[in-house]
Amino acid sequence: MTIGERIKSARIGAGLSQRNLAREMGLSAMAISKYENGEIVPRSGLLIQMSEILGVNVDYFFRSISVNLSEPQYRCRKPLKKKEANQVHAKVREWLERHLEIELILGEERTLTLPSKETCRVASPDGIEDAARRVRDEWSLGLDPIENVMDVLEQHGIRVGVIDAPDTFDALTFYYDDNTPVIAVNNDTPGDRQRFNLAHELGHLLLQVEGGVDEEAAAHRFAAAFLVPKEMAFRELGQRRRNISPREFYLLKHKWGMSMSAWLHRAAELGIISKSTAERLWTLFNQNKWREREPGVPLPQEHPTNMKLLVLRALSEKKISTSRAQELLGGEQPGEQCVESF
């Protein structure tokens, strides 16, 4: 990407129009347009000012690496406006470039170890349950709660990023260079919903849907089955129930890292509770607005660790400076003092 293209991408990522950026900088919109079109290269002082306004490091404008992204699949509670979608796309691109750059600096190649297409070919709800179980088996996850979903995905070669995005955005999945899957999730999301979104996007990556099965519904079922295998759901709740208390859902949420609402949905789809019982419980959830904000202590968010570990390794081995490490971490302090204290 040229400097002009990077200015445009950073502006879109910041959610600013050319006119808004020009106003912030005390310039004309025409000047910004000329910068973005490559007609004029802004002097260093303007680039520094621009980087501060757009929330990027000035080195971003001179970054050599760029990526080709496939059309992303968004998971949102309501459709994103075009401006919002462009903003999310630009932020993901900027994060991924930093991720790939530190891999390049270290000569690190991530091995992608996904289950085969045959493993994930599904044509029915039972097939989805079986596929989720096979994925757990291939990844040696057993039947216990998954401690950290992000770590599991990163360990198998999927790049996982967390970005600031509109409230309605949950997650997106895409490929870069046609062969490496990437999942990005909203930074402002409770841990239980974040984990479900990651598992849902994993479903989109893996499932080979056949027989008229709805892809979105299949990914939703896969996410629940991946987080809580049906054998364990029956063990926790029993085979048949006439009622389940909210307190049970709350305790299971913190044990398994899956929301109370998802547990209610899981109990219904496995036939543990009847349709009428599920409707009564959903009414209770709606009355208390628990579908918007669940009661009690929220589940902590997960954070990707692979990129930070690579940056710290490069810093420890003197392959990058502290300021470069901070730039690669998106402005976050690398914690060099902490590293040196050990």
Where are each of the predicted segments found?
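Active-site hotspot residues in diverse enzymes, especially metal/ion-binding acidic/histidine motifs
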Residues: 1-342
